[in-house]
């Protein structure tokens, strides 16, 4: 993981120094691939997607502790999944073509899917000393998480079907009946994120 992070940093600095487009493309690909490798190795190091037998833990803990454990596991898995999707979109942006769909999904998958869900994961742990109130994990539900996932799915559908070609750059753009459709489509995605935040605060 540390080796991958070092390669990421070096390739990032090189991309700033050199201006040759071929070299920049190569460095960008190296950066994205090593970034993916570092994220993957880190996820593996914390057993984000398995590799650790937690059956004994689940058997011993109950109530609030079990709810907190399940809340943590679910949010870690889904947040890292969005991080991987974002990095893959960045790699496709470099290799396939600089389409808006890839660029848009990189930003939203990482900023909302990964960072947003990571913040949601730690907020119940950080807020009690600030607000002077204990947050009970048993009272938390999956509505904010589901709203975030639906929001990003809507975003992806809008990017790939309403805005961008389905595969290669030779296919051109898919026409939509009205630009307002696109506005409403992406707007609904944004409002779902707001709804997710509000529902999280209400919980």
Regions found by a protein language model. Give the residues of each.
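Hydrophobic alpha-helical transmembrane segments of multi-pass integral membrane proteins
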Residues: 1-203
